[in-house]
A protein has these predicted regions:
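Extracellular/luminal regions of secreted and cell-surface proteins that mediate adhesion/ECM remodeling
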Residues: 280-320
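N-terminal secretory signal peptides that target proteins for export/translocation
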Residues: 1-25
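Short coil/turn motifs at beta-sheet boundaries
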Residues: 31, 175, 207, 300-301
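Sec-dependent signal peptide cleavage junction
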Residues: 40-54
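Extracytoplasmic Ser/Thr/Pro-rich, glycosylation-prone low-complexity segments
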Residues: 52-283
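Sec-dependent N-terminal signal peptides
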Residues: 22-39
């Protein structure tokens, strides 16, 4: 499994290269200190922050849903026929790891694998999490540290009435803009699973099911939750469904919740899309590309320390 931490910084300079040369010993030392400090310090590149109907997470993720005028467009791509089905029976156990198909950055860390949380409506990164059937407010320790929940509640499958019930996944698209689609098909409340009276009798609890997707987008690292049918037959799936994202960054737990049980509303409307957008990436605009250190070092006039700095930024210094 590939997990890659990111450590980046930003500084803006006008010149592409600068040669730092000082004649006296104190100035030589100061030149090196300044260069090293500029390269290793973390500076923030400010960019317009996307607006969100219900706010921004502590890490900087924002979300909008398709009910907003500038929100995402609901566009369902069904993968029941084309995708890989790996779960078709009721279980609280986890499955995986499965390949994402590309590197996906989430809360500042890149992942190439994911795990499924059984029939309970969540996925995790960095390790499996089982038996999390009761939804809590996000971020929730019950989901581990890094997770995406789209239909988190005590789920199950009534396969006898819904033969396509299960969890499917497929990576689609061309390199650079691929998508991982994870589809929960015909999810029901646990009490309506196979073998129960609700399932056996064909109750609305078993036949009016939930179908939704988690979509990971390559390059943009955005996340889309899509709900084809989010109004099931049971009070418990409509009211208890919880959705959001959470992860660890800079040693702290972060999370952004779209819905927790009956808050902010009892149900999610059918044919809804919810898009989570990460904050603008930090960048290394100033790079120390070469140094010149004379050997042996001395206080002589011609004993010159040199440092070449490359500007990878997009802005220029201004006089002042």
């Amino acid at each position: 499994m590939l997990i890659k931490g990111l450590n980046q910084g930003v500084l803006h300079m006008q010149e592409t290269y600068k040669e730092i040369e000082k004649k006296d010993w104190a100035a030589k030392l100061m030149a090196i200190v300044v260069v090293v400090t500029m390269v290793t310090s973390t500076f923030v590149l400010f960019a317009p922050e996307a607006s969100a109907r219900t706010g921004t997470g502590s890490f900087g993720y924002v979300f909008k849903d398709s009910a907003e005028s500038d929100g995402p467009t609901y566009a369902w791509t069904d993968i029941v026929s084309s995708g890989t089905k790996f779960l078709g029976s009721t279980t609280d156990g986890s499955q995986g790891p499965f390949d994402i198909g590309f590197d996906f950055e989430f809360y500042g860390t890149s992942y190439d694998e994911w795990y499924n949380g059984g029939d309970n409506g969540y996925i995790t990164f960095g390790g499996a999490v089982s038996n999390a059937w009761t939804p809590y407010a996000i971020p929730a320790s019950q989901l581990g540290t890094t997770a995406i929940a789209a239909g988190w509640f005590d789920g199950g499958f009534c396969v006898s009435k819904n033969p396509n019930s299960g969890v499917y996944y497929e990576t689609v698209g061309d390199a650079g803009s691929r998508q991982l689609i994870i589809q929960m098909q015909d999810q029901v409340y646990w009490s309506a699973r196979d073998g129960t009276s609700y399932c056996n009798s064909g109750s609305a609890w078993a036949t009016n099911t939930l179908t939704w997707q988690i979509i990971l987008n390559e390059g943009t690292n955005t996340i889309v939750l899509q709900y084809k049918d989010a109004t099931g037959g049971s009070y418990y799936d409509n009211e208890y469904l919880t959705a959001g994202i959470q992860g660890i960054a800079d040693g702290a737990q972060h999370g952004l919740q779209y819905k927790y049980r009956s808050t902010p509303s009892n149900t999610i409307a059918d044919e809804t899309a919810v898009k989570f957008v990460p904050p603008p990436p930090k960048r290394n605009d100033l790079k120390l590309s070469a140094t010149t250190i004379p050997q042996p070092m001395s206080l002589a006039e011609d004993n010159i320390l040199g440092a070449t700095v490359t500007n990878n930024g997009v802005n220029c210094d201004t006089a002042g």
